[in-house]
Amino acid sequence: MMQALTNPFPIGSSSLIHCMTNEISCEMLANGILALGCKPVMADDPREVLDFTKQSQALFINLGHLSAEKEKAIRMAALYANQSSLPMVVDAVGVTTSSIRKSLVKDLLDYRPTVLKGNMSEIRSLVGLKHHGVGVDASAKDQETEDLLQVLKDWCQTYPGMSFLVTGPKDLVVSKNQVAVLENGCTELDWITGTGDLVGALTAVFLSQGKTGFEASCLAVSYLNIAAEKIVVQGMGLEEFRYQVLNQLSLLRRDENWLDTIKGEAYE
Protein backbone atom coordinates (compact mmCIF):
# COMPACT_ATOMS: atom_id res chain seq x y z
CA MET A 1 0.00 0.00 0.00
CA MET A 2 2.78 2.44 0.85
CA GLN A 3 4.21 1.87 -2.61
CA ALA A 4 0.79 2.58 -4.13
CA LEU A 5 0.67 6.08 -2.64
CA THR A 6 2.14 8.85 -4.76
CA ASN A 7 3.67 12.07 -3.48
CA PRO A 8 1.05 14.84 -3.70
CA PHE A 9 3.69 17.56 -3.64
CA PRO A 10 4.17 20.04 -5.06
CA ILE A 11 0.48 20.92 -4.91
CA GLY A 12 -0.63 21.35 -8.50
CA SER A 13 -3.24 24.00 -7.85
CA SER A 14 -3.84 26.28 -4.89
CA SER A 15 -7.25 24.85 -4.05
CA LEU A 16 -9.76 26.64 -1.83
CA ILE A 17 -10.67 24.45 1.15
CA HIS A 18 -13.92 25.35 2.92
CA CYS A 19 -13.65 24.45 6.60
CA MET A 20 -16.80 24.52 8.71
CA THR A 21 -15.04 23.98 11.99
CA ASN A 22 -14.94 25.10 15.59
CA GLU A 23 -13.51 28.36 16.88
CA ILE A 24 -10.92 26.58 19.04
CA SER A 25 -8.92 25.02 16.19
CA CYS A 26 -9.87 27.40 13.39
CA GLU A 27 -6.54 29.23 13.27
CA MET A 28 -4.48 26.03 13.36
CA LEU A 29 -6.44 24.56 10.47
CA ALA A 30 -6.06 27.70 8.40
CA ASN A 31 -2.29 27.75 8.91
CA GLY A 32 -2.00 24.02 8.26
CA ILE A 33 -3.82 24.34 4.94
CA LEU A 34 -1.62 27.28 3.97
CA ALA A 35 1.49 25.28 4.92
CA LEU A 36 0.59 22.66 2.30
CA GLY A 37 0.05 25.25 -0.43
CA CYS A 38 -3.73 25.61 -0.47
CA LYS A 39 -6.08 28.36 0.68
CA PRO A 40 -8.53 28.11 3.60
CA VAL A 41 -11.88 29.76 4.07
CA MET A 42 -14.07 29.44 7.16
CA ALA A 43 -17.73 30.34 6.66
CA ASP A 44 -20.64 28.87 8.61
CA ASP A 45 -23.31 31.57 8.39
CA PRO A 46 -26.32 30.13 6.51
CA ARG A 47 -26.69 33.45 4.67
CA GLU A 48 -23.33 33.08 2.91
CA VAL A 49 -22.24 29.48 3.30
CA LEU A 50 -23.15 28.43 -0.25
CA ASP A 51 -21.31 31.38 -1.75
CA PHE A 52 -18.06 29.96 -0.38
CA THR A 53 -18.88 26.28 -0.84
CA LYS A 54 -19.54 26.83 -4.53
CA GLN A 55 -16.06 28.31 -4.98
CA SER A 56 -14.29 25.55 -3.06
CA GLN A 57 -12.52 22.42 -4.25
CA ALA A 58 -13.19 20.48 -1.04
CA LEU A 59 -15.43 20.78 2.03
CA PHE A 60 -14.44 19.91 5.61
CA ILE A 61 -17.23 19.67 8.18
CA ASN A 62 -16.22 19.49 11.85
CA LEU A 63 -18.96 19.22 14.47
CA GLY A 64 -17.13 20.98 17.30
CA HIS A 65 -19.05 23.91 18.88
CA LEU A 66 -22.27 22.98 17.11
CA SER A 67 -25.22 25.38 17.19
CA ALA A 68 -28.62 25.46 15.52
CA GLU A 69 -27.42 28.06 13.01
CA LYS A 70 -24.24 26.15 12.24
CA GLU A 71 -26.20 22.91 11.82
CA LYS A 72 -28.42 24.64 9.26
CA ALA A 73 -25.36 25.85 7.35
CA ILE A 74 -23.74 22.41 7.52
CA ARG A 75 -26.80 20.75 6.02
CA MET A 76 -26.90 23.34 3.23
CA ALA A 77 -23.22 22.88 2.37
CA ALA A 78 -23.40 19.07 2.55
CA LEU A 79 -26.40 18.99 0.23
CA TYR A 80 -24.57 21.15 -2.28
CA ALA A 81 -21.46 18.96 -2.02
CA ASN A 82 -23.54 15.88 -2.71
CA GLN A 83 -25.33 17.42 -5.68
CA SER A 84 -22.14 18.80 -7.23
CA SER A 85 -19.79 15.87 -6.41
CA LEU A 86 -17.63 18.13 -4.24
CA PRO A 87 -15.24 16.06 -2.07
CA MET A 88 -16.40 16.21 1.54
CA VAL A 89 -14.88 15.18 4.88
CA VAL A 90 -17.12 14.87 7.95
CA ASP A 91 -15.42 14.82 11.36
CA ALA A 92 -17.74 13.27 13.95
CA VAL A 93 -16.50 15.25 16.94
CA GLY A 94 -18.30 14.54 20.21
CA VAL A 95 -20.83 11.98 18.98
CA THR A 96 -20.05 9.76 21.98
CA THR A 97 -21.67 12.37 24.22
CA SER A 98 -24.07 14.42 22.10
CA SER A 99 -27.18 12.77 20.66
CA ILE A 100 -27.69 15.87 18.50
CA ARG A 101 -24.30 15.45 16.86
CA LYS A 102 -24.75 11.71 16.37
CA SER A 103 -28.13 12.29 14.72
CA LEU A 104 -26.63 14.95 12.45
CA VAL A 105 -23.78 12.69 11.34
CA LYS A 106 -26.22 9.91 10.49
CA ASP A 107 -28.22 12.40 8.42
CA LEU A 108 -25.04 13.56 6.67
CA LEU A 109 -24.38 9.99 5.57
CA ASP A 110 -27.26 10.47 3.13
CA TYR A 111 -25.12 13.11 1.40
CA ARG A 112 -22.38 10.53 0.84
CA PRO A 113 -19.27 12.16 2.34
CA THR A 114 -15.99 11.07 0.79
CA VAL A 115 -14.41 10.51 4.21
CA LEU A 116 -15.99 10.03 7.64
CA LYS A 117 -13.45 10.73 10.37
CA GLY A 118 -13.40 10.26 14.12
CA ASN A 119 -11.38 8.87 16.98
CA MET A 120 -11.78 5.27 18.09
CA SER A 121 -14.53 6.01 20.59
CA GLU A 122 -16.48 8.26 18.22
CA ILE A 123 -16.50 5.76 15.38
CA ARG A 124 -17.36 2.86 17.70
CA SER A 125 -20.30 4.91 18.95
CA LEU A 126 -21.49 5.71 15.43
CA VAL A 127 -21.48 2.11 14.26
CA GLY A 128 -23.16 0.76 17.38
CA LEU A 129 -20.24 -0.81 19.24
CA LYS A 130 -19.57 -0.49 22.95
CA HIS A 131 -17.45 2.55 23.78
CA HIS A 132 -16.12 4.51 26.75
CA GLY A 133 -15.60 7.95 25.21
CA VAL A 134 -16.03 11.03 27.40
CA GLY A 135 -16.60 14.49 25.97
CA VAL A 136 -14.70 14.73 22.68
CA ASP A 137 -11.85 12.42 23.74
CA ALA A 138 -11.26 8.76 22.97
CA SER A 139 -10.91 6.26 25.78
CA ALA A 140 -7.89 4.00 26.20
CA LYS A 141 -10.44 1.19 26.64
CA ASP A 142 -11.65 1.62 23.05
CA GLN A 143 -8.45 0.85 21.16
CA GLU A 144 -9.33 -2.75 20.20
CA THR A 145 -9.53 -2.77 16.41
CA GLU A 146 -10.55 -6.29 15.37
CA ASP A 147 -14.29 -5.94 15.96
CA LEU A 148 -14.31 -2.36 14.66
CA LEU A 149 -12.60 -3.29 11.41
CA GLN A 150 -15.17 -5.95 10.65
CA VAL A 151 -18.09 -3.58 11.26
CA LEU A 152 -16.48 -0.84 9.17
CA LYS A 153 -16.01 -3.24 6.27
CA ASP A 154 -19.73 -3.98 6.43
CA TRP A 155 -20.58 -0.27 6.53
CA CYS A 156 -18.41 0.32 3.48
CA GLN A 157 -20.61 -2.09 1.54
CA THR A 158 -23.58 0.13 2.39
CA TYR A 159 -21.62 3.31 1.61
CA PRO A 160 -19.24 2.10 -1.11
CA GLY A 161 -17.93 5.54 -2.04
CA MET A 162 -16.95 6.46 1.51
CA SER A 163 -13.75 5.82 3.46
CA PHE A 164 -13.44 5.76 7.25
CA LEU A 165 -10.49 7.47 8.93
CA VAL A 166 -10.18 6.38 12.56
CA THR A 167 -7.47 8.05 14.63
CA GLY A 168 -5.77 6.48 17.62
CA PRO A 169 -2.45 4.97 18.73
CA LYS A 170 -2.80 3.04 15.48
CA ASP A 171 -4.74 4.87 12.77
CA LEU A 172 -7.20 2.92 10.64
CA VAL A 173 -8.30 3.74 7.11
CA VAL A 174 -11.06 1.56 5.72
CA SER A 175 -12.72 1.65 2.31
CA LYS A 176 -14.81 -0.87 0.40
CA ASN A 177 -11.77 -2.69 -0.97
CA GLN A 178 -8.83 -1.63 1.22
CA VAL A 179 -7.73 -1.44 4.83
CA ALA A 180 -4.66 0.35 6.20
CA VAL A 181 -3.28 0.22 9.73
CA LEU A 182 -0.84 3.11 10.18
CA GLU A 183 1.63 3.46 13.04
CA ASN A 184 3.42 6.81 12.77
CA GLY A 185 2.96 9.54 15.34
CA CYS A 186 3.91 10.59 18.86
CA THR A 187 1.99 10.99 22.08
CA GLU A 188 3.04 14.64 22.26
CA LEU A 189 0.40 15.47 19.65
CA ASP A 190 -2.09 15.07 22.49
CA TRP A 191 -0.45 18.02 24.24
CA ILE A 192 -2.25 20.56 22.09
CA THR A 193 -5.84 20.90 20.97
CA GLY A 194 -6.84 20.75 17.34
CA THR A 195 -4.44 18.18 15.92
CA GLY A 196 -7.27 15.75 15.21
CA ASP A 197 -9.21 18.50 13.48
CA LEU A 198 -6.09 19.31 11.47
CA VAL A 199 -5.97 15.75 10.11
CA GLY A 200 -9.47 16.26 8.70
CA ALA A 201 -8.49 19.53 7.05
CA LEU A 202 -5.38 17.97 5.50
CA THR A 203 -7.54 15.14 4.20
CA ALA A 204 -9.67 17.74 2.42
CA VAL A 205 -6.51 19.27 0.94
CA PHE A 206 -5.47 15.96 -0.61
CA LEU A 207 -9.00 15.28 -1.84
CA SER A 208 -8.88 18.62 -3.65
CA GLN A 209 -5.86 17.30 -5.54
CA GLY A 210 -7.75 14.35 -6.97
CA LYS A 211 -6.80 11.70 -4.40
CA THR A 212 -9.36 9.07 -3.44
CA GLY A 213 -10.83 9.05 0.05
CA PHE A 214 -8.58 6.15 1.01
CA GLU A 215 -5.45 7.80 -0.39
CA ALA A 216 -6.22 11.23 1.06
CA SER A 217 -6.85 9.75 4.51
CA CYS A 218 -3.61 7.76 4.52
CA LEU A 219 -1.63 10.76 3.29
CA ALA A 220 -3.15 13.23 5.75
CA VAL A 221 -2.77 11.26 8.96
CA SER A 222 0.71 10.06 7.99
CA TYR A 223 1.86 13.54 6.96
CA LEU A 224 0.93 15.11 10.29
CA ASN A 225 2.33 12.21 12.30
CA ILE A 226 5.65 12.16 10.43
CA ALA A 227 5.97 15.94 10.75
CA ALA A 228 5.46 15.61 14.51
CA GLU A 229 8.04 12.82 14.74
CA LYS A 230 10.68 15.21 13.43
CA ILE A 231 10.29 17.55 16.39
CA VAL A 232 12.73 17.28 19.28
CA VAL A 233 10.47 17.60 22.31
CA GLN A 234 12.86 17.17 25.24
CA GLY A 235 12.42 20.21 27.43
CA MET A 236 9.97 21.76 24.98
CA GLY A 237 6.89 23.58 26.25
CA LEU A 238 3.39 23.40 24.82
CA GLU A 239 3.47 26.58 22.77
CA GLU A 240 6.85 25.79 21.25
CA PHE A 241 5.67 22.30 20.30
CA ARG A 242 2.56 23.75 18.67
CA TYR A 243 4.70 26.19 16.69
CA GLN A 244 7.04 23.42 15.58
CA VAL A 245 4.16 21.23 14.39
CA LEU A 246 3.07 23.95 11.97
CA ASN A 247 6.68 24.63 11.06
CA GLN A 248 7.32 20.99 10.15
CA LEU A 249 4.10 20.83 8.13
CA SER A 250 5.55 23.48 5.84
CA LEU A 251 8.97 21.81 5.63
CA LEU A 252 8.15 18.12 5.20
CA ARG A 253 6.68 18.62 1.73
CA ARG A 254 10.18 19.50 0.50
CA ASP A 255 11.32 15.96 1.27
CA GLU A 256 10.73 13.91 -1.88
CA ASN A 257 11.12 10.69 0.10
CA TRP A 258 8.76 11.37 3.00
CA LEU A 259 6.41 8.61 1.90
CA ASP A 260 9.18 6.09 2.60
CA THR A 261 8.88 6.83 6.32
CA ILE A 262 5.23 5.78 6.57
CA LYS A 263 4.90 2.89 9.01
CA GLY A 264 2.10 0.38 8.75
CA GLU A 265 0.50 -2.21 6.55
CA ALA A 266 -2.39 -2.51 4.14
CA TYR A 267 -4.47 -5.30 2.76
CA GLU A 268 -7.64 -5.91 0.79
Swiss-Prot record:
Molecular function terms from GO: ATP binding; hydroxyethylthiazole kinase activity; magnesium ion binding
Keywords: ATP-binding, Kinase, Magnesium, Metal-binding, Nucleotide-binding, Thiamine biosynthesis, Transferase
Cofactor: Mg(2+)
Binding positions for substrate per the UniProt entry: 42, 194
Pfam family, one: HK
Reactions accelerated catalytically: 5-(2-hydroxyethyl)-4-methylthiazole + ATP = 4-methyl-5-(2-phosphooxyethyl)-thiazole + ADP + H(+)
Enzyme nomenclature, EC number: 2.7.1.50
Matches recorded under Gene3D superfamilies: 3.40.1190.20
UniProt xrefs under InterPro entries: Hyethyz_kinase, Ribokinase-like
Pathway: Cofactor biosynthesis; thiamine diphosphate biosynthesis; 4-methyl-5-(2-phosphoethyl)-thiazole from 5-(2-hydroxyethyl)-4-methylthiazole: step 1/1
GO-annotated biological processes: thiamine biosynthetic process; thiamine diphosphate biosynthetic process
Family in the record: Belongs to the Thz kinase family.
Function noted in UniProt: Catalyzes the phosphorylation of the hydroxyl group of 4-methyl-5-beta-hydroxyethylthiazole (THZ).
The name this protein goes by in its record: Hydroxyethylthiazole kinase 2
Source organism (scientific name): Streptococcus pneumoniae (strain CGSP14)
Lineage start: Bacteria, Bacillati, Bacillota, Bacilli, Lactobacillales
